Design a protein with these regions (language model features):
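Residue-level recognition of single "structural anchor" positions
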Residues: 1-259
Length: 259
């Protein structure tokens, strides 16, 4: 699928728990149990859930998530935003960086090694939140890759629900994380509905994301219906807004779709 250059991806992760049974762990089946993180990527313009990944809070998991996102971009480079986890910048440089040979200095000695630098089209900004007593007291935005004016202009093009200009933030993905907890029983806190292992949790996330993208219309994406029709609004799903689908899918269509 092809996305425009104004697309904004917001990687984010949140924590969940899989209670670990010591007897199961003793039998060698405990690797997929215990605490884990859910990594997610979201396109706010279309309210599209791009990828979800169950893993640890490591560089390896960040690489897997961004490789999934890369498969959705069809070669385009959007504006990336995230929290201040350093793994995102490292992996973005791996995937979208270029090797640059330093200019010779004319001085004696061993020449400098080639360096990995960001490509001119790569744009990435971070949001850092400082907390005191469990409350956010300060929010700082920093631009890691890209020109400041270009990043700010692209972020401002994303309109908020009240019509005001957007800014560099992670509020959309955080709100979608709340919706995900409401939709998926496995993520509910202090209940007996927890996942028993990571594999089943990953399958549940994939289904919920597909249902939200193709089956469930989003109120912020609806369009004004033609005056001759009986409807006031035409419902649209995130997949329709992104140009992936031309209709609202039924649940049966999703379950019977052959990938």
């Amino acid at each position: 699928m092809s996305f425009g250059p104004s697309l904004k991806k917001t990687p984010k992760s949140h924590w969940t728990d899989h209670p670990k049974n010591p007897l199961i762990a003793k039998k060698g089946r405990g690797r997929s149990l215990g605490s884990t993180w859910i990594w997610r990527a979201f396109a706010p313009e279309f309210r599209l859930r791009l990828a979800s990944l169950v893993g640890n809070r490591t560089l390896y998991s960040a690489r897997r998530l961004l490789q999934k996102i890369r498969g959705c971009l069809n070669g385009t480079l959007p504006l990336f935003t995230s929290d201040s986890l350093p793994h995102y910048a490292d992996v973005l440089l791996e995937l979208y960086g270029q090797w640059k040979k330093p200019q010779p200095t004319g001085l004696p000695g061993r020449p400098c090694n080639v360096q990995r630098v960001a490509s001119p089209d790569l744009r990435y900004a971070q949001v850092h939140k400082e907390r005191q007593g469990g409350r956010v007291v300060k929010v700082t935005q920093s631009i890691i890759f890209g020109k400041r004016r270009t990043v700010q202009t692209q972020a401002a093009s994303l309109k908020r629900a009240d019509g005001s200009e957007g800014q560099i933030n992670t509020s959309y993905i955080e709100r979608d994380n709340l919706a995900l907890r409401q939709e998926l029983r496995r993520l509910a806190r202090k209940t007996l509905g927890f996942s028993k292992n990571r594999r089943e949790l990953q399958h549940a996330l994939d289904f919920i994301d597909a249902h939200d993208n193709f089956v469930k219309p989003h109120g912020a994406l609806r369009l004004k219906a033609p005056p001759e029709g009986s409807r006031t609004w035409e419902p649209r799903t995130p997949a329709m807004a992104a140009g992936i689908s031309d209709h609202v899918w039924k649940l049966e269509e999703l379950l019977c779709y052959k990938a």
